[in-house]
């Protein structure tokens, strides 16, 4: 039951279950137990006028006689004479005098109503008992598809009129003052809990809560997209089907089924025709699968009006999904695949991926697609058994340290993959990734050179080096430095997948509030295919070429020296772990440790559950919920605050009712409902333990004052913060283009400050790989530099000149009505 005595269709978060404040104020109708002297003067006069005009036998004298029958209300003869004399006054009223005397003796509104009923004064009874409000139609919870026309309805009856006001959670909706709340085109951000307040001139009531769940079009199954034109707001339809998967033991299984319809759909998962206990959400997750999880899965979706079954998904656990014949000797050798000739397939010693998405640039146009691209690629690579580190919005110094940590995870035979989405450029065949703190304009000393990173990866004798660069490759006219790099080793294991051709721009598709880069939109559909990586990228290029959105704008370019049939699906070698592998696994595991869920118990008896979820390696969601409240507490509200200044958290975006309100659109389906959510980003900046405060405010029944309690929580260093990337590894690897010998090594940007000094870190495993750090006083150890410069001055194609204000050309490309998506140019460099 809700706080107003009505059953809830869907429970909103505990912190907002109290109804929003009514703008009409307290009720003006007289309480039944109130005495007459508390009635408003206008109401008393209207009652007295009716009694003064009443026919004989139903007037004020008969009212006095009825009141006298209840001893305490008996009036004396002097009192009645006083009432009679009122007729001699110009505006005197015997009835008004009588009502006031009865009020002084404690006559209640209920008693007066009984007296008037006995005297058959039915015409004035509504003044004391106005017809109450009655909600006849409550809004219905529903699940819809982004872009649909959606309508929430509330109907009520009352006297003399009814007014409406809609709320989302506890926030009033502007212009939501009719009986219908209409979304001409509903968006993902519109998802949440809604309630309608109805009021007349004297009182107000609240409707039942209604939950609106909005499914993103990007998640919709291809087979469903073909029938979207005839979609119904009310009919139950499954729009996202679970997909078959081939997994290895220890990986995560995630099956998803999403339906739309009204009333709100419910879910029940099945495995091999048997229902799975407590699995009643859109998604079914097994963090670490084993052979016992192999089978056929499907989901039964239903509501009060209809039901449907999803398609069946086959989940296969193991190295291969094919049966093979082998001898006893071959069977004994399966546990020791010492060489790839035994299996006929290349083996990876391990698989490691670094994913960087830069969006929130300080001095340049902001991007949207890296958020979605990095998240989706992370999930796909984990299905392929990659150890993935995914990071958003890194400065130059943080990018250098992230690559350093990435290099520590590499070793002989390990597959290394680097994905970058953000601003970038290419000069003289060298690709440069632009950090979020790059100045305006930027040059090579402010950016990271991809070719230098490749050189360092080759030193690790990796089995495969894959670079996926989703950035622009136009020339930077502000950077006329020509770095001369040392020749790369001939390793025949290098693959570059460029999102666009040399000299061209890369674009992102914006739709339903989220965005995909064009490259990732097509790559994600093929990444899990068991094909040679170059063949896979060729097919992605063909897919892009067939799309009318990309023709003449963007085309995938592939550069490769791969001489073996290596694929991202290659199995990881099952040999016993070496010391280096153990350190590598520990280093990666440390960067992905979440704080354990905890239950805080306050002195008042309230219990608050704290939970944590990772969106990226440097982004964490904190969700809070009130799991126990003593009955004597009628209202309680919990929130988190006082975060370290390193994280720069905006309080306005904390403690929200939905993950989407915090800016987290991607993990909302995996988080528990009915909580308050806070998103912590840039965890790599955290210098000390993550300490924050949980505040609880509550109110006891019968008391108006609100009581507050606080508890301080220390969760250590979560996720990537454990690696202390802000300290670095005691060196600054030469990822930038080298400068003149007589130039200072450090750039003028603040991000490089202190990079040449050694800071020891107990969380860094650098000493395992590099026992000699070189001269700690040197700005750049000579053994870390792999590029050289032309003597004296740099080579320039343009004469020296002064640069004026740097122009920004990130203007969306014009589209026609036939192109439903808008383009946003990732290019940062432009000519004035």
Curated annotation (Swiss-Prot):
Q: Mention any Pfam family matching this sequence.
A: Peptidase_C14
Q: What is this protein called?
A: Mucosa-associated lymphoid tissue lymphoma translocation protein 1 homolog
Modification sites for N-acetylserine? 2
GO CC term (a single one): fibrillar center
**Residues covered by region (Caspase-like):** 356-570
This protein's UniProt keywords: Acetylation, Cytoplasm, Disulfide bond, Hydrolase, Immunity, Immunoglobulin domain, Nucleus, Phosphoprotein, Protease, Repeat, Ubl conjugation pathway
Outline what the protein does.
Protease that enhances BCL10-induced activation: acts via formation of CBM complexes that channel adaptive and innate immune signaling downstream of CARD domain-containing proteins (CARD9, CARD11 and CARD14) to activate NF-kappa-B and MAP kinase p38 pathways which stimulate expression of genes encoding pro-inflammatory cytokines and chemokines. Mediates BCL10 cleavage: MALT1-dependent BCL10 cleavage plays an important role in T-cell antigen receptor-induced integrin adhesion. Involved in the induction of T helper 17 cells (Th17) differentiation.
User: In the Enzyme Commission scheme, what number(s) does this protein have?
Assistant: 3.4.22.-
Q: Which residues form the Death domain?
A: 45-132
- Species for this entry: Mus musculus (Mouse)
Motif range for Nuclear export signal?
377-384
PANTHER family recorded for this chain?
A: MUCOSA ASSOCIATED LYMPHOID TISSUE LYMPHOMA TRANSLOCATION PROTEIN 1/PARACASPASE (PTHR22576), MUCOSA-ASSOCIATED LYMPHOID TISSUE LYMPHOMA TRANSLOCATION PROTEIN 1 (PTHR22576:SF40)
InterPro entries to which the protein is assigned, alphabetical:
Caspase-like_dom_sf, Caspase-related_regulators, DEATH-like_dom_sf, Ig-like_dom, Ig-like_dom_sf, Ig-like_fold, Ig_sub, Ig_sub2
Subunit and interaction comment = Homooligomer; forms oligomers which bind to TRAF6. Forms a complex with CARD14 and MALT1; resulting in the formation of a CBM (CARD14-BCL10-MALT1) complex. Forms a complex with CARD11 and MALT1; resulting in the formation of a CBM (CARD11-BCL10-MALT1) complex. Forms a complex with CARD9 and MALT1; resulting in the formation of a CBM (CARD9-BCL10-MALT1) complex.
- Residues annotated as region Disordered? 1-39
Q: Which residues form the active site?
A: 423, 472
The primary location reported for this protein is cytoplasm
From the UniProt record, which GO molecular function terms apply? cysteine-type endopeptidase activity; endopeptidase activator activity; endopeptidase activity; identical protein binding; kinase activator activity; protease binding; ubiquitin-protein transferase activity
- UniProt family annotation: Belongs to the peptidase C14B family.
């Amino acid at each position: 039951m809700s706080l107003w005595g009505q059953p809830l269709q869907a429970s909103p978060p505990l912190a907002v279950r109290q109804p929003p404040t009514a703008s009409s104020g307290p009720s003006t109708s007289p309480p039944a137990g109130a005495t007459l002297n508390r009635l408003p003067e206008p109401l008393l006069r209207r009652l007295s006028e009716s009694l003064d005009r009443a026919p004989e036998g139903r007037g004020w004298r008969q009212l006095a006689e009825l009141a006298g029958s209840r001893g305490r209300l008996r009036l004396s003869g002097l009192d009645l004479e006083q009432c009679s004399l009122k007729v001699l006054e110009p505006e005197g009223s015997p009835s008004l005098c009588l009502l006031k005397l009865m009020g002084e003796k404690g006559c209640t509104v209920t008693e007066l109503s009984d007296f008037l009923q006995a005297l058959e004064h039915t015409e004035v009874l509504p003044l004391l008992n106005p017809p109450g409000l009655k909600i006849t139609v409550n809004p219905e919870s529903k699940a819809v598809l982004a872009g649909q026309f959606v309508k929430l309805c509330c109907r009520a009856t009352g006297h003399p009129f009814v007014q409406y006001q809609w709320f989302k959670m506890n926030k009033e909706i502007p212009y939501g003052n009719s009986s219908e709340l209409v979304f001409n085109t509903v968006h993902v951000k519109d998802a949440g809990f809604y309630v309608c307040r109805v009021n007349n001139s004297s009182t107000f009531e609240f409707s039942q809560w209604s939950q609106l769940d909005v499914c993103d079009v990007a998640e919709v199954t291809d087979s469903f997209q073909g029938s979207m034109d005839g979609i119904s707001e009310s009919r139950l339809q499954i729009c996202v089907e679970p997909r078959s998967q081939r997994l290895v033991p220890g990986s995560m299984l995630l099956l998803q089924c999403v339906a739309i319809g009204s009333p709100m759909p419910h879910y029940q998962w099945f495995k091999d025709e048997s229902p799975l206990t407590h699995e009643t959400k859109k998604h079914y997750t097994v963090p670490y699968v084993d052979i016992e999880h192999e089978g056929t899965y499907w989901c039964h979706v239903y509501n009060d009006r209809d039901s449907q079954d999803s398609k069946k998904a086959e989940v296969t656990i193991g190295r291969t999904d094919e049966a093979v014949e082998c001898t006893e000797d071959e069977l004994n050798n399966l546990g020791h695949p010492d060489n790839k000739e035994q299996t006929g397939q290349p083996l990876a010693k391990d698989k490691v991926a670094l994913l960087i998405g830069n969006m929130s640039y300080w001095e340049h146009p902001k991007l949207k697609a890296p958020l979605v691209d990095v998240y989706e690629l992370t999930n796909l690579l984990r299905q392929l058994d990659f150890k993935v580190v995914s990071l958003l919005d890194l400065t130059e110094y943080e990018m250098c340290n992230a690559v350093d940590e990435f290099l520590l995870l590499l070793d002989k035979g390990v597959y290394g993959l680097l994905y970058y989405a953000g601003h970038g450029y290419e000069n003289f065949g060298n690709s440069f990734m632009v950090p979020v703190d790059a100045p305006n304009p930027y040059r090579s000393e402010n950016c990271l050179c991809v070719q230098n990173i490749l050189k360092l990866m080759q030193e690790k004798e990796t089995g495969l080096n894959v670079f996926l660069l989703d950035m622009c490759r136009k020339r930077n006219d502000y950077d006329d430095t020509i770095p001369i790099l040392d020749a790369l080793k001939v390793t025949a294991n290098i693959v570059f997948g460029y999102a666009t051709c040399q000299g061209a721009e890369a674009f992102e598709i914006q739709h339903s509030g989220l965005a995909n880069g064009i490259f990732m939109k097509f790559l994600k559909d093929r990444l899990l295919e068991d094909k040679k990586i170059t063949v896979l990228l060729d097919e992605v290029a063909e897919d892009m070429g067939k799309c009318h959105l990309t023709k003449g704008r963007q085309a995938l370019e592939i550069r490769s020296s791969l001489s073996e049939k290596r694929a991202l699906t290659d199995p990881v070698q099952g040999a016993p772990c070496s010391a280096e592998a153990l350190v590598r696994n520990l280093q990666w595991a440390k960067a992905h440790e979440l704080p354990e869920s905890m239950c805080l118990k306050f002195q008042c008896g309230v219990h608050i559950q704290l939970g944590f979820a990772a969106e990226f390696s440097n982004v964490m969601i904190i969700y809070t919920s009130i799991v126990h409240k003593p009955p004597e507490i009628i209202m309680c509200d919990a929130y988190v605050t006082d975060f370290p200044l390193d994280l720069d958290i905006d309080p306005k975006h904390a403690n929200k009712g939905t993950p989407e309100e915090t800016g987290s659109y991607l993990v909302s389906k995996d988080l528990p409902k009915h909580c308050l959510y806070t998103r912590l980003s840039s965890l790599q900046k955290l210098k000390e333990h993550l300490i924050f405060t949980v505040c609880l405010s509550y109110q006891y029944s019968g008391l108006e004052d609100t009581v507050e309690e606080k508890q301080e929580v220390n969760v250590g260093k979560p996720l990537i913060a454990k690696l202390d990337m802000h300290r670095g590894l005691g060196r600054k690897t030469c990822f930038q283009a080298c400068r003149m010998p007589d130039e200072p090594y450090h750039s003028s940007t603040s991000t490089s400050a202190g990079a040449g000094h050694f800071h020891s870190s107990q969380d860094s495993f650098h000493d395992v790989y590099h026992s000699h750090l070189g001269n700690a006083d040197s700005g750049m150890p000579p053994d870390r530099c792999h590029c050289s410069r032309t003597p004296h001055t740099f080579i320039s194609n343009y004469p020296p000149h002064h640069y004026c204000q740097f122009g920004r050309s990130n203007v969306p490309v014009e589209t026609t009505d036939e192109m439903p998506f808008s383009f946003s140019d990732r290019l940062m460099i432009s000519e004035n």
